[in-house]
Amino acid sequence: MKRTFIMVLDSFGIGASADAKKFGDEGADTLGHIAEACARGEANVGRSGPLTLPNLSRLGLGKAAEESTGTFPVGLDKNADIIGAYGYASELSSGKDTPSGHWEIAGVPVLFDWGYFSDVENSFPQELLDKLVKRANLPGYLGNCHSSGTVILDQLGEEHMKTGKPIFYTSADSVFQIACHEETFGLDRLYELCEIAREELTDGGYNIGRVIARPFIGDKPGHFQRTGNRHDLAVEPPAPTMLKKLVDEKGGEVVSIGKIADIYAQVGITQKVKATGLDALFDATIEEMKKAGDNTIVFTNFVDFDSSYGHRRDVAGYAAALELFDRRLPELMALVKEDDILILTADHGCDPTWPGTDHTREHIPVLVYGPKVKPGSLGHRETFADIGQTVAAYFGLSPMDYGKNML
C-alpha cells in the first residue's frame, strides 16, 4: 500500500538562497535566527531557553540547516541519532510566495513573473476599484495600500463596521486581500466580493496569484481577530501537478488539510478538511492518516508559522510553535507504515528577525522519513520540484517536467 504524507511548515526557511540578494533577503535565516534569539534569552515569552526540537533533529533538520548555511543551529542536538533522509532545496520559481512554493513542491515551478501592486499607497488601479464598487454595490472602500493584516484591522476595522466599506490591501506578494467583519458585513457577502475581484483581476490581465478573503470579528481596536474562515482564490497551476497526476493516472486520493486546496485552486484535490490552529491541523492530519488507503496523499499546510509568527515578526511565538510541532511529531511518525513516506518541508522563508513583514527568499528543509527510506544526506536540491518528482516516481506516475527523484 503506497501512501505519502506531506507536511508544509509554512515559511520555515533554513537559510538564504544564492539569489536572496535580488529579493533584499541576503543573510535571512528563519531557523538560524530563531535559534540564536532563543539561545540569547530573547524569546522567553510563553516558552524559555534554547530552541528544543529533538524529533526534528532526529529527522536531520539541524544537519540540513548546517548544509544550507555552514552553521549548525544553536541549541539543536548535534549528536542526534539520524533516522531520516535530509537535505535542503533552492527555489526555481521567480517569486517567494505561497503558490509558487507549493506548486514547485508539486513539480510545477512558476517560471513566469506574477503581477504585483507595488505602490505602497493607492496600490490598486482606479479602474479596478470602480468596477468592484459597481459590481458588488459597495458604498466605497478603505485601505487601498500595503499593510500587515493585523495592523490594518486596528487602523480601519471600526470605520469598516460603521460604513460597510470593505478593506482592500496588498503586500509584496501577488495578492489582493479583502478584510470584512463576519457579522456586520457577512461572510457569504465577503466571499461573493472575492469572487468578483478574482474575475476582474483575471479578465483585466493583472496576473495576480491570489485573492484572499480575510474575515474578522471583534468590536474595537486591540480586540479585532481574524477567524479561521479565510478563503484563497488562486489561479490554477499552469501544468498538471503530481497531485493531479495521482488522481488522473491512478484514481488516487489527495486529501487537503488547511489551505492546500485553495493554493492549488482545488485542482487535483479529492477531499478537503478544514482546520484552524496548529493543534487542530495536527488532529485532522492524524485522523486522515489513519483512514488513508492505497494511492493516497495527505497534504497539510501548517499556516500559523507564517501568518501568526513570521509576518508578525514574533520570534518567541514562532519558537513556541516549532516546539509544539516537534512535541506532536511522534504522533505522525507512529502512523507511518512499511511502504509509507512522510515528507516535512516548507514553501519559503519568513524570518521573524528580518526587517519588514514580508517573506524571505530561503532554502527549505527536505526531511523524508519511512521504514524503507535510507537515513542520510540528500544534499542540495536545485529545485523544490525534486519533492514532486520523488512522489511521482514513488506512485509510478508519468515523470514531471522538472525535478529529480531523491530516493
From Swiss-Prot:
BP term (GO), one: 5-phosphoribose 1-diphosphate biosynthetic process
Pathway the protein contributes to: Carbohydrate degradation; 2-deoxy-D-ribose 1-phosphate degradation; D-glyceraldehyde 3-phosphate and acetaldehyde from 2-deoxy-alpha-D-ribose 1-phosphate: step 1/2
Cofactor: Mn(2+)
Localization annotation: Cytoplasm
Chain residues that bind Mn(2+) 1: 10, 347-348
Matches recorded under SUPFAM superfamilies: Alkaline phosphatase-like (SSF53649), DeoB insert domain-like (SSF143856)
UniProt name for this protein: Phosphopentomutase
Organism: Yersinia pseudotuberculosis serotype O:1b (strain IP 31758)
